Amino acid sequence: MKKYDVAAMGELLIDFTQNGYSDQGNPIFEANPGGAPCNVLAMLQKLGKNTVFLGKVGQDGFGYQLEKALKEMGIGTEGLCFDPTVHTTLAIVQNKDDGDRDFWFYRNPGADIMLCEDEIREELISDAKILHFGSLSLTDEPVRSATKKAVAAAEKAGLWISFDPNLRKPLWKSEALAKEQISYGFKHCQILKISDDELLWFTEETDFDRAVKRLQQEYGIALILLSMGKNGSAAYCGNQKVMVPAFVNKNTIETTGAGAVSYTHLRAHETDQYL
């Protein structure tokens, strides 16, 4: 019997999210726990699943805040490391009028980048059913090598692997490097969550169905989940396609983590039904 339904690795950071304006008209930013991998784990915990995180934060106030948040959610922190010299990664999230966001990062370096191969606890991975990761842990060394060690351990232990490109172009040295490393994620996953913008950017297609077919043929991905914002989402498995309309809120305020939420519900169902 596996101890964990899902193990995730990657960035754990502080999202400074705009939350109103001061009396002087300046934007006010709130320090929220963030990072796509742990957004997924947080939702899985709420759905009654057991999860564990592998990653690195700074040995600072923000790092301890993040550790506390994980423990309060019930996410396993056995794989969480602390860097004594590099601070916790920070993201500035500024909302647009349509509810979408702009991101700026303080990550040159940030603690999440500093996770090393010898800090990967393979026994945590082998004790899970699914390993989830994204491309932010492929942008730089040493975390890139650590991520690939975790993926190799998952494959050796027979886990399903899920991948979310979660493309943040400013964090990559070049788009060519981004495509190279995201292609690595495609090659090693059975479950892919990808946004409409990411799909068309990577494939250079203009049609979603044609772009998905290219990924299926080139990488053999079993299940592709496509998020399209206000246009809903779609799931592709072989020749089957299911479309779901969006739940549109005309007064959208904040969309950070929305993709992780929809992704999580389906993966919780997969854990129950297929693994």
Show which residues each predicted segment covers.
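Glycine-rich phosphate/adenosyl-contacting loop at the front of the ribokinase-like
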Residues: 1-76, 252
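Active-site metal-binding loops of divalent metal-dependent hydrolases
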Residues: 12, 136, 165
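Anion (oxyanion) recognition and catalysis
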Residues: 45, 71, 155-156, 186
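Conserved N-terminal subdomain of the carbohydrate kinase-like
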Residues: 50-133
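Conserved phosphate/ATP/ADP-binding segment of small-molecule kinases
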Residues: 157, 171-243
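Short beta-strand/loop segments at the ligand-binding rim of alpha/beta enzyme cores
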Residues: 160-161
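Short basic (Lys/Arg) and small-residue
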Residues: 259
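Conserved small/polar residues in nucleotide/adenosyl-binding loops
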Residues: 264-271
